Amino acid sequence: MIPYKGKYHFTSESVTEGHPDKVADQISDAVLDVLLEQDPDSRVACETMVTTGMAIIAGEITTRGYADLPQVVRDTIKEIGYNNSSMGFDWQTCAVLSSIDKQSPDIAQGVDRQDPENQGAGDQGMMFGFACDETPTLMPAPIFWAHQLSQKLTAVRKDGTVDFLRPDGKTQVSFEYVDGRPVRINNVVVSTQHAEQASQTDIIDAIRTHVIRPVLEPSGFFNEKDCEIFINTTGRFVIGGPMGDCGLTGRKIIQDTYGGMGSHGGGAFSGKDPSKVDRSGAYMGRYIAKNVVAAGLAPKCEVQIAYCIGVADPVSVLCTSLGSSDISDEVLTQAVRDVFDLRPYHISKRLDLRRPIYKKSACYGHFGREIPEFSWERTDAVDDLRAAARR
């Protein structure tokens, strides 16, 4: 458990959409979206691997829809920005291999029900949600600001502000905390792929000027004179993306969530339809935790939900303030049980999860971005939670 007394540092990282693991995540979720758009009841478990000049898709899919998998892959890669074979990965020329089977009937019989309200969980496991009052979107400060840097790094590449940047990149932010509260940014790390001709001096100047300062100066935590800044510290990052590292779906689960703050059940999200509680349960956990904090019941909240395959009701539910509230965890947990139906069908219905919304979630965090598609970021249950906690 993270200490809440004294001074300490906490660090989180983010990657851009051109990072090979994120390329894989986006392809998996692009396939999911194409199928959900045609058939909202699609069962999808789509895994992707990308490497030099090649993308491989495998998994289990049962659907009434159709996906032109090579075209989905190429469109996604093109949108990310791998548009030249010199990068080792080019949307026009990369090979696309696929191996797709139907969902196992053994799993399907545990999930499908004549009464859809009693739909069983698609797997066993535990999922976590987290929220805290460190940022306006109730996310931990380190991951929030790391994602802001990654998004800006991509933006200045795509709009041509810094024309020598390439798609792959990573950011990292370390915060100093005092008695559990973030007080300043202690150090920042940015690594970005770049064109062959770009000099280290030009890269450092561009990242400081166009990425770090515009993003972090408004935060209130950043003093450049009192912050270590590390930019492309190997001195060269020309070979990147799937040419530099093999990318796989589901290998960035910490930055997909809370940057290491709070717990993680281990399940990845991308490529999975809402019947997979790895995804829908974690989204519901975030929704609950965010509403608990927004309701003023606790400045920090962690929710755990656990399921058994084929069983609709969770086998356990916990809502804890991690010692940050005068309201007991027992009261918080009972309030959550009173307000929210945590059966998979009702999670999907409440959050309207059977929509083609997932490709947007596949990079820069599934949580903490308050866009219309992300229903789990709403705070529309605060009144119900306050009333339940008073009972």
From Swiss-Prot:
SUPFAM superfamilies: S-adenosylmethionine synthetase. Pfam families: S-AdoMet_synt_C, S-AdoMet_synt_M, S-AdoMet_synt_N. It is an enzyme of class 2 (transferase). L-methionine binds at E60, Q103, D245, K276. It is found in: Cytoplasm. Its EC number is 2.5.1.6. This is S-adenosylmethionine synthase. K(+) binds at E47.
